[in-house]
């Protein structure tokens, strides 16, 4: 059944779902001194910022306030004949739960009892691993002011690149956590998924000051979350019953920067990675339109980031962001929200680096980006809440090569150096989301109290991509000498992805034990839409023009994901919790998945190239054996049937979603008020991953390791080093296609111990510290590979999860804030980790593989992953601020931040290709110490 048809049925029959947490909750019971429950107590929840809520306690004395916006609240309990009870300073945070036991005393006269709330540092219902990022953490801890830097502060998360004072804020940073790659991350904003399904990444960049809080989950996700990857939920600011606002200006430049170049770097003539100038400015403002009925919020921010890469080339980024929100409480027990975000990114010099000169960099421009969301929430009773969320986003950008489209692009296989120019790329990614969320509470049912969160989510996203190589040619050199060339045909592919999700969570409280039972079902598809492609400029005979009709590849994912979690109060006072979780997670299917079988994908064929006239340009008569006899490699088309509208590739009709299985067991203890320590043991296994072996569609034959012959051996000598390598080839010429299927026998094991210490801001100080030790290995089994090349050295070794980064076995982090007298505040963030892997390789020419269409060269690992590493990494950032408070007129804050305080020149990357003349040369170092000056005004 098609997802769209099933969607309509689901909304009619079920109409419930539970989205990513964007609120906090208060639960409790009202009793007399002897413990007898008090029904009918009028309980009012109020704050200076939001409209009040009220309810009456049940026959069992229970009460619940759910979906409470973050902030400071007051709880008032009234019943004739009893003293009025007032609890102030209830500090509600995203995803946190207050469990209150309120005792009312009999009163002869009308009296009030007022107490100050103590927020629990240990959440008695949390089964997973999550971090609530408060305003203090966002604004007071020194950072480059983007979400990816906040991720760096979270326990167990490793980032690909170090962001020193904002030098990397113009680009999405890679990250990995607990064995899950960045492609499994779930991006959410105000309770609805915003993940870009074409890139499986964030859909845009953000104004950092638009965030009220963040909630980041790295393990033990409930059934509202599809994958086991990092789940981020951004809670954005909204207006309240008093006018509030803030403005900021931050500045740093080369005059505020040190020099950390080593003699090695100076000897190479490198300038070092540096900031030229960064400015960050903007405002946020909101308040009431009608008190207790309607509120607004507006914001605008700019980050102008001008960097110098290690070779002295410029890399400049301009981020602009406008955000607006309207909140309405027009009817009793009903809330509405309309929000809009208009982000934009312009970047000149993308990809600049030691192997990418300016002419090969790209200039990026946005293509009409915006995001809009409408939410309506209604509380039908104290036991039932429903919320409908509708969202639409339109993302897009284009990349134009600085070298232009009239020059042929080149790449040196040995040195890694790019030359000439680069390809043109553009993408548009419109998408829709619908969530219908529900929350239902049932007392004294099946031996306990049950809180159900349940429902349905639907997402549809299109992915329109166009890729064009200049003159439809790509040149390849071998250490400066002409080697091979690739003739290309533009890629113009439109795919569409859909996901329909059902999920149910039951939180069941029985005394000290809380059980969380959950199930989730995801139904996912990807289809190909109509498109047209032009013939190759240089090779129209084998790469002609095509008109592609829309078609369905015929596969659908039905992924069932059960979850079971528990917490147990070991001491009975809510201060020592044993937690556990057992879960299976599916993987999110990219909207692009069907492009594997689209004839509209970028297609190419490779040949040996002899530059006969020495002009450095490829012409067809210089391609040896063109078009068929000399074919070395190809992709995206059938060379022997070039006009067919059917791709030689296939997608297995039995293709399933990859799985991550998880087991967590942990202990958390409140040591003293506002301070806790925790330890968590984590086991994970990733399996049923994707696999793309060679495939002959005519015979339905999938090529396996039995079709490969070898090994062929070579002894390579480079700069006095000798390497004995081996590789395999086919016993016959390769087929035209590849099949997308599941990899049999292959799995990845992840084991970790994570220790954290958390001190919430009180008594003038705050701290978050963590230590993680982890091991992740890859296992191919008997049938988990086709080409045996490199398998012997990779099997059972450390996993090269993202190529090299994210591969540290251990890491430690600490953020700290202390409020000094006279309005001064000092804070810092320190981190240390094992150096990333140094995956050394050699590249060799392989005529045996070239003869069967597997390519003219191959890269061979020379050491098991993890045997060689980059140096230990450590860093320290410090901030000093001074607050000036003006009674009735807000607060002015002066800021001095220092990043990489120790001015370390730690190497971030070296050339790993042992056969290259630049082997082991520095390609990236840590940016030097830089001071950032800032001024902020709050009211």
Where are these regions (language model features)?
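Signature of Gram-negative outer-membrane beta-barrel scaffolds
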Residues: 311-313, 421, 447-573, 623-624, ...
């Amino acid at each position: 059944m098609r997802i769209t048809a099933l969607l309509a049925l689901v909304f009619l029959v079920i109409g419930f779902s539970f989205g990513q947490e964007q609120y906090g909750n208060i639960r409790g019971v009202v009793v007399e001194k002897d413990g007898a429950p008090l029904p009918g107590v009028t309980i009012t929840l109020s704050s200076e910022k939001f409209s009040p809520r009220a309810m009456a306690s049940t026959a069992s004395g229970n009460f619940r306030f759910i979906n409470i916006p973050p902030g400071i609240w007051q709880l008032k309990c009234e019943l004739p004949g009893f003293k009025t009870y007032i609890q102030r300073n209830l500090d509600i945070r995203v995803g946190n739960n207050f469990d209150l036991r309120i005792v009312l005393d009999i009163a002869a006269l009308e009296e009030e009892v007022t107490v100050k709330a103590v927020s629990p540092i240990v959440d008695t219902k949390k089964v997973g691993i999550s971090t609530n990022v408060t305003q203090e953490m966002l604004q007071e801890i020194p950072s480059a002011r983007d979400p990816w830097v906040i991720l760096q502060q979270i326990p167990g998360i490793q980032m690909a690149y170090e962001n020193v004072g904002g030098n990397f804020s113009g680009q999405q940073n890679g990250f990995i956590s607990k064995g899950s790659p960045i492609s499994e991350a779930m991006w959410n904003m105000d309770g609805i998924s915003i993940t870009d399904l074409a890139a499986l990444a964030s859909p845009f960049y953000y104004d950092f000051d638009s965030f009220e809080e963040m909630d980041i989950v790295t393990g033990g996700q409930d059934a509202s979350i599809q994958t086991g990857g990092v789940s981020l939920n951004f809670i954005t600011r909204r207006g309240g019953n008093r006018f509030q606002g803030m403005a900021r200006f931050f500045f740093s430049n080369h005059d505020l920067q040190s020099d950390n170049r080593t003699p090695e770097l100076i000897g190479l003539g490198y300038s070092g990675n540096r900031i030229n100038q960064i400015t960050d400015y903007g405002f946020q403002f909101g308040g009431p339109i009608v008190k207790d009925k309607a509120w607004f919020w507006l914001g605008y921010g700019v980050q102008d980031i001008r960097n110098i890469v290690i070779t002295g080339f410029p890399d400049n980024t301009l981020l602009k962001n406008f955000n607006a929100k309207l909140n309405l409480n027009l009817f009793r027990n009903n809330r509405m929200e309309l929000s809009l975000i208009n982000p934009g990114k312009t970047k000149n010099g993308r990809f600049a680096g030691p192997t990418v000169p300016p002419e090969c960099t790209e200039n990026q421009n946005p293509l009409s980006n915006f995001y809009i969301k409408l939410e309506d929430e209604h509380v039908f009773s104290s036991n039932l809440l429903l919320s409908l969320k509708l969202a639409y986003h339109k993302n897009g950008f284009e990349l134009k090569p600085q070298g232009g489209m009239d020059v042929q692009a080149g790449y040196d296989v040995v040195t890694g150096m790019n030359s000439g120019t680069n390809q043109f790329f553009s993408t548009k990614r419109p998408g829709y989301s619908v969530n219908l969320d529900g929350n239902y509470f049932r007392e004294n049912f099946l031996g306990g109290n049950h809180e159900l969160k349940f429902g349905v989510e639907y997402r549809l996203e299109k992915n329109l991509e166009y890729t064009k190589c200049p003159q439809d040619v790509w040149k390849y050199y071998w250490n400066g000498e002409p080697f091979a060339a690739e003739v290309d045909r533009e890629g113009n592919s439109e795919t569409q992805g859909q996901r329909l999700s059902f999920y149910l969570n039951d939180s069941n409280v029985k005394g000290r034990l809380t059980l969380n039972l959950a199930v989730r079902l995801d139904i996912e598809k990807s289809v190909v839409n109509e498109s047209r492609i032009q013939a190759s400029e240089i090779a129209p005979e084998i790469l002609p023009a095509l008109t592609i009709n829309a078609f369905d590849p015929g596969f659908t994912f039905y992924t069932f994901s059960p979850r079971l979690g528990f917490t147990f109060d070991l001491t009975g006072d809510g201060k020592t919790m044993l937690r556990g979780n057992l879960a299976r997670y599916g993987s999110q299917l990219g909207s692009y998945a069907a492009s594997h079988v689209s004839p509209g994908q970028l297609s190419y064929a490779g040949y040996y190239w002899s530059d006969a006239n020495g002009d450095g340009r490829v012409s067809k008569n210089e391609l040896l054996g063109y078009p068929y006899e000399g074919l070395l490699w190809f992709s995206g088309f059938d060379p022997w049937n070039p006009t067919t509208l059917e791709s030689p590739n296939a997608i297995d009709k039995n293709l399933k979603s990859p799985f991550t299985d998880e087991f967590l067991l942990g202990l958390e203890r409140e040591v003293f008020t506002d301070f806790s320590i925790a330890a968590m043991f984590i086991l994970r296994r990733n399996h049923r991953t994707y696999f793309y072996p060679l495939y002959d569609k005519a015979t339905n034959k999938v090529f396996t390791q039995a079709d490969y012959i070898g090994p062929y051996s070579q002894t390579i000598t480079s700069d006095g080093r000798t390497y004995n390598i081996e590789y395999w080839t086919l016993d016959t010429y390769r087929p035209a296609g590849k099949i997308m299927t599941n990899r049999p026998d292959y799995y990845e094991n992840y084991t970790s111990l994570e220790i954290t210490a958390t001190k919430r801001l009180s008594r003038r100080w705050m701290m978050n510290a963590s230590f993680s030790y982890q091991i992740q290995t890859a296992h191919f089994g008997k049938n988990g590979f086709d080409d045996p090349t490199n398998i012997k050295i990779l099997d059972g070794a450390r996993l090269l999860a993202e190529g090299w980064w994210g591969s540290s076995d251990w890491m430690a982090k600490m953020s700290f804030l202390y409020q000094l007298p006279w309005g001064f505040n000092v804070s810092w963030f320190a981190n240390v980790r094992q150096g990333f892997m140094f995956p050394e390789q050699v590249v060799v020419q392989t005529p045996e593989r070239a003869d069967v269409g597997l390519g003219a060269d191959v890269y061979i690992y020379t050491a098991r992953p993890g045997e060689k590493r980059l140096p230990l990494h450590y860093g320290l950032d410090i901030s000093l601020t001074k607050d000036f408070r003006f009674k009735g007129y807000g607060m002015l804050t002066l800021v001095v931040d220092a990043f990489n305080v120790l001015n370390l020149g730690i190497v971030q990357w070296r050339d790993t290709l042992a056969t290259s003349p630049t082997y082991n040369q520095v390609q990236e170092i840590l940016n030097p110490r830089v001071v950032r000056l800032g001024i902020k005004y709050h009211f």
